């Protein structure tokens, strides 16, 4: 299900907590969804009962990645993620970091890619303080949205990566 604002997910979070279900949270741009994203999201969902994915708004992606990004508008990125059987909820954030969402939802598990070093994961101290878990999932080698875009722009076939 797509929640236009993360605050709309709060009643569902209360229901999950009351039912004793474990909530997993991750976030990212998810522009040009690729197999690396799929592997990470599927592994994230396996860590709990429900997975919520917070995606950067278009303005947030532009501020991080530059004026030519995102390639895919936020509504379409959300629709694609929502169609995945291992993603239970999708929401958006326009702030530079997802800290406000993390502290409000208090996920049981916070997931990021293994490229995020110790102390670099936004929300890690907070999640650990309330007894949650922070998991860094190994990245599938060879996948990067930026690399895919560069290959397309240079005319290099993706098969020759």
Q: What is each stretch, according to the model?
A:
Residues 1-161:
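Nucleotidyltransferase catalytic core that binds NTPs
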């Amino acid at each position: 299900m797509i929640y236009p604002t993360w605050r709309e997910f709060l009643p569902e979070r209360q229901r999950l907590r009351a039912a004793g279900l474990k909530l997993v949270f991750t976030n990212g741009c998810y522009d040009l969804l690729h197999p690396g994203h799929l592997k990470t999201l599927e592994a994230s969902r396996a860590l709990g009962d429900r997975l919520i994915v917070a995606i950067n708004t278009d303005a947030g992606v532009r501020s991080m990645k530059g004026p030519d990004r995102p390639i895919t508008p936020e509504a379409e990125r959300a629709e694609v993620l929502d169609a995945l059987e291992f993603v239970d909820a999708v929401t958006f954030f326009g702030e530079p970091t997802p800290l406000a969402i993390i502290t409000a939802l208090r996920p049981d598990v916070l997931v990021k890619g293994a490229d995020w070093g110790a102390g670099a994961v936004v929300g890690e101290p907070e999640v650990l303080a309330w007894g949650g878990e922070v998991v860094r999932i190994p990245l599938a080698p060879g996948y990067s949205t930026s690399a895919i875009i560069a290959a397309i722009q240079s005319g290099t076939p993706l098969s020759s990566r």
